[in-house]
Amino acid sequence: MVILLVACVVGSCSITRELEQNASPIAFTEVNNYFVKNNSVPQKLLRKVINTESEFRAIFGEAAVMGSNGQPTPINFKRQIVLAVVSPVTDIDTQMYPLSVLQNGNAIIFNYKVDKGSKMSYSICPFTAVVLDRPATNSSYEIYWNER
């Protein structure tokens, strides 16, 4: 089954507000315990639909830590896809996290938040990513990326 997902960056919030009115929530899992590889750091904000493990591994590396929640989020690319937003390197304390994923027909809306703090003495490459079940149909989907 081949699924075509078309990425669309929303220039106007009114489009997403309109789509969100009749949208249904989609279950998602936040991607944890990964990092952006040094050779994959974008020069500008990257919004990407990731369909395969090789695409994912080209951008992200595992960052397991000790403890009960220390393992990287498992992803089964036969059944799931990843929506990722990756920022360029910054020395500003930046946290990115998902708020919701909604669906209205063939439109999928990924709402995420970016919190910025103060200048730091080191650089980071902030990102947020979610794992979704792969859509059941062969329809094309338009992805709307919405920073709140």
Map each language-model feature to its residues.
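Sec-dependent bacterial lipoprotein signal peptides
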Residues: 1-11
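Exposed, flexible binding/inhibitory loops of compact, secreted disulfide-stabilized domains
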Residues: 13-148
